């Protein structure tokens, strides 16, 4: 049994190092930038640049992988990520960092597409669910481990940037020494907005707005923590627990949505996330434990929304179209993450650190309002015609290639 999973474990080891490096680097940069006196606008633009680079990578990386092959392409992406991480430690300048974050987003998209296509090819119809579950587990654990590492050293020193570079280099070893056959060439990415909207207006608008909220929080959450005066260790724990809380709540919320109209569950979670955001804005908590508890409650609701939206879209998708629909929604989510950091930074600059939650609350309130409007205009999908809910990571942008690994994908879609 374990022999069949050996090549998958090798890929997952590389994934773990890659995500740990990404998690650490993504948290380290805003903390160091805040300590260096970077403007809020610049810190927000770093998140926008990363998202723009990631989306561009989703479109362009397949061409590069076809030319160089999976192993060489992944090695190139990981090496570039390491060089960029070390470069951000050498050159402390907000303009340089914004440009380098765009490059990081691009190479991370390419690296994820290679790994996800490789995992998809190694998975069979019988073990696809297990492989997908392992991938989700590694994703959450690695990001959390990377983020918690930031508390082990002074963010003002270069040592953490070196650790990021080492982790990126370690990620390329499992694929570089692998003797397994490389997968089929990556497929080009396309985005049919009209067809996506016709399939599910709620999922279309929802995924974009979820990207706005998650992009704002993911980029500026650490800046919010630093400005209200909580410690680096508390910031790392806060950012990690938001992700973990969302992962834990996804299954019970998903099961409820399997038994009723998913849109009611989506609207309820969006309202809850908006209310918690409003409470944080008004209460202006400054105690570390209180802030961590409130943001964990926020994450538990906010980070279930993406999986609910994708599940709702899949309920309406015709047989064999899940990968295309899910891939399109991932790109919409990515476009949303370009907007969120700029919106959050503008509000934080105009008012106070807690204004970050005005940006997230506005996005979540818009999701709830539009979902409730659509409930009146379109009947729900009968229970017997729905696909079962599956958890999805909403703490980072995914790639359309990863949608083919989801067990809901039909065999012909993964071909």
Name what the model sees in each region.
Residues 150-151, 165-185, 367-375:
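C-terminal membrane-cytosol helix-exit motif in multi-pass small-molecule transporters
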Residues 72-86, 165, 264-279, 361:
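Structural signature of the two symmetry-related core transmembrane helices
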Residues 57-70, 150, 154, 249-261, ...:
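Helix-to-loop junctions at the C-terminal end of transmembrane segments
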Residues 102-137:
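Cytoplasmic helix-loop-helix junction between adjacent transmembrane helices
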Residues 263-307:
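C-terminal transmembrane helical hairpin of 12-TM major facilitator-type secondary transporters
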Residues 110-123, 303-317:
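Intracellular juxtamembrane helix-capping segments at the cytosolic ends
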Residues 1-3, 183-191, 315, 374-415:
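Intrinsic disorder in cytosolic terminal tails and internal cytosolic loops
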Residues 2-51, 203, 215-224, 228, ...:
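Helix-loop boundary and gating motifs at the non-cytosolic
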């Amino acid at each position: 049994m374990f022999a069949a999973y050996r090549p998958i474990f090798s890929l997952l080891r590389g994934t773990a190092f890659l995500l740990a490096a990404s998690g650490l680097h993504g948290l380290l940069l805003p903390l160091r930038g805040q300590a260096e006196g970077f403007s809020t606008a610049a810190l927000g633009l770093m998140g926008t640049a990363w998202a723009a680079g990631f989306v561009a990578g989703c479109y362009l990386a397949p061409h590069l992988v076809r030319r160089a092959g999976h192993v060489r392409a992944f090695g190139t992406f990981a090496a570039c990520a390491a060089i960029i991480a070390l470069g951000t430690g050498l050159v402390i300048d907000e303009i340089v960092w914004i440009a380098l974050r765009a490059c990081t987003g691009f190479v991370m998209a390419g690296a994820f597409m290679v790994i996800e296509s490789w995992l998809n090819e190694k998975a069979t119809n019988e073990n696809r669910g297990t492989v997908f579950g392992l991938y989700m587990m590694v994703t959450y654990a690695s990001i959390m481990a990377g983020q918690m590492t930031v508390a082990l050293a002074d963010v003002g020193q270069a040592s953490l940037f070196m650790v990021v570079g080492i982790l990126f280099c370690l990620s390329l070893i499992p694929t570089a020494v692998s003797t397994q056959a490389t997968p089929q060439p990556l497929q080009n990415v396309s985005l049919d907005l009209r067809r996506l909207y016709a399939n599910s207006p709620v999922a279309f608008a929802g995924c974009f707005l979820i990207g706005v909220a998650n992009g704002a929080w993911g980029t500026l959450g650490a800046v919010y923590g630093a400005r209200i005066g909580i410690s680096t260790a508390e910031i790392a724990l806060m950012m990690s627990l938001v992700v973990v809380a969302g992962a834990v709540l996804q299954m019970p919320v998903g099961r409820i949505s399997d038994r009723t109209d998913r849109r009611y569950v989506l609207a309820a979670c969006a309202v809850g996330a908006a209310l918690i955001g409003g409470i944080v804005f008004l209460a202006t908590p400054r105690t570390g434990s209180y802030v961590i508890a409130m943001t964990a409650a926020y994450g538990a609701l906010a980070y279930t929304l993406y999986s609910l939206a994708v599940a709702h879209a899949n309920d309406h998708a015709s047989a064999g179209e899940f990968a295309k629909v899910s891939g399109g929604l991932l790109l919409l989510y990515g476009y949303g993450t370009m907007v969120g950091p700029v919106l959050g930074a503008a509000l934080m600059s105009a008012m106070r650190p807690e204004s970050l939650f005005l940006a997230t609350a506005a996005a979540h309130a818009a999701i709830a309002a539009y979902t409730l409007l659509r409930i009146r205009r379109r009947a729900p999908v009968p229970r017997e015609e729905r696909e079962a809910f599956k958890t999805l990571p909403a703490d980072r942008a995914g790639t359309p290639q990863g949608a083919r690994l989801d067990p809901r994908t039909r065999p012909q879609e993964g071909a």
